[in-house]
């Protein structure tokens, strides 16, 4: 296995921890994309209160800019205007913990125009350049081959069964867009790497090294913080469709793939494991590749984004597992991360102290029985931190 290059101060030195209680997580209703699935109305136009009144005039304080070498990378967020302030907290966390040191750009995408308020608040928070884009209508609508009456009946039935976001149109558009179109937006053309950020997330630990440079130097193409199992009722035929694609295009499957992460029986069935895509750092050429492009187009034509409720997380995860060399997938175990309802928190005390983490290791989900990260470590023969068994839950 190739040696991972990382600054010496960040190398894990695992020490045995005492027995810790693990919080049992039962809430599954907040899975990926929750913020964008909610109905919303545009925020009112921004009132220029900061430039009026008793002579007070707002001006952005320009902080010293990082002048060292940087990768062609950006943060990217799909967000509605109404989620501005829950996103602002996410941006502040990312800036404080990481980006204030490196000043990477931030791309914001929406299916409608961003308000002046949204642009003013986010540009004041981001240390890099902010860019705002509207999603093309063809990437946020029913494609011509979809039977909309059939799709509406499916939504009705899934809603009656109380399947998460089963009756949502916007959630389906979001999943389809994140699966196959965000990286095609013209604003993404300037970049080779991205870090996806959503509203209401938090980074628990300082990140003092450039994660994009880390990915490039260590030949990684996809990285995650949390893995979990998908809600099976949302993807009943996703794996059947994937198998048909694999049988039709065996030449596109990487010879050193990670099929054993997503299937326990050599591809006969899907074990529901996926990387939680509300946090992902990846090379854009993974999604731009002929292999993934063919896979997404095949899925899209089958209609499962609308006739079922296929999520972008399992689609991305299966794509990464099939089309990458398994060594190109990385787990960021030193990046403490939170998205309702799960925490990723380093259980190694030395890492938490060195990185000024503010998380409770007893709430770490990484090694929980419902997480798939233990499987990721096992199949790749990676060393696990001391005391990980105490966090199985």
From Swiss-Prot:
Glycosylation sites: 120
Species of the source: Saccharomyces cerevisiae (strain ATCC 204508 / S288c) (Baker's yeast)
Record-linked Pfam families: Glyco_transf_15 (PF01793)
Enzyme class: transferase
Enzyme Commission number(s) of this protein: 2.4.1.-
SUPFAM superfamilies according to UniProt: Nucleotide-diphospho-sugar transferases
Coiled-coil regions listed in the entry: none
Record topological domains on the Cytoplasmic side: 1-16
UniProt entry tagged with the keyword Transmembrane: yes
Protein's name according to its UniProt entry: Alpha-1,2 mannosyltransferase KTR1
Lumenal topology ranges: 35-393
């Amino acid at each position: 296995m190739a040696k991972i290059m990382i600054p010496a101060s960040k190398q894990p030195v695992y020490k045995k921890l005492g027995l810790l209680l693990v919080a049992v997580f039962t809430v599954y209703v907040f899975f990926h994309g929750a913020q964008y699935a909610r109905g919303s109305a545009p925020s009112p136009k921004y009132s220029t209160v900061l430039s009026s009144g008793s002579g007070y005039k707002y001006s952005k304080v320009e902080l010293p800019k990082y002048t060292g070498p940087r990768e062609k990378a950006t943060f990217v967020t799909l967000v509605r205007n109404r989620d501005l302030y829950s996103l602002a907290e996410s941006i502040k966390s990312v800036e404080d913990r990481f980006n204030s040191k490196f000043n990477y750009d931030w791309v914001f995408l929406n299916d409608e125009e961003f308000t002046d308020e949204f642009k003013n608040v986010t540009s004041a928070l981001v240390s890099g350049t902010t860019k705002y884009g509207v999603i093309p209508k063809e990437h946020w609508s029913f494609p011509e081959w979809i039977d909309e009456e059939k799709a509406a009946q499916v939504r009705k039935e899934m809603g009656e069964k109380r399947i998460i976001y089963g009756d949502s149109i916007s959630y389906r558009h979001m999943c389809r867009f994140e699966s196959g179109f965000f990286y095609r937006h013209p604003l993404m053309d300037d970049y080779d790497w991205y870090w996806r950020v959503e509203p209401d997330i938090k980074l628990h630990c300082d990140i003092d090294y450039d994660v994009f440079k880390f990915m490039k130097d260590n030949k990684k193409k996809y990285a995650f913080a949390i893995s979990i199992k998908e809600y099976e009722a949302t993807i009943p035929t996703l794996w059947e469709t994937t198998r048909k694609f694999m049988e039709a295009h065996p030449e596109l499957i990487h010879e050193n793939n990670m099929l054993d992460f997503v299937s326990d029986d050599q591809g006969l069935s899907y074990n529901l494991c996926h990387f939680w895509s509300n946090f992902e750092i990846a090379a854009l050429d993974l999604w731009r590749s002929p292999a993934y492009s063919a896979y997404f187009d095949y899925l899209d034509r089958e209609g499962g984004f609308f006739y079922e409720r296929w999520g972008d997380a399992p689609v991305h995860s299966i794509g990464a597992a099939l089309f990458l060399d398994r060594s190109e997938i990385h787990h960021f175990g030193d990046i403490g991360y939170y998205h309702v309802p799960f925490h990723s928190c380093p259980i190694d005390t030395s890492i938490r102290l060195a990185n000024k983490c503010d998380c409770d290791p007893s709430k770490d989900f990484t090694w929980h029985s419902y997480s798939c990260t233990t499987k990721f470590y096992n199949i790749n023969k990676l060393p696990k931190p001391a005391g990980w068994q105490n966090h199985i839950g």
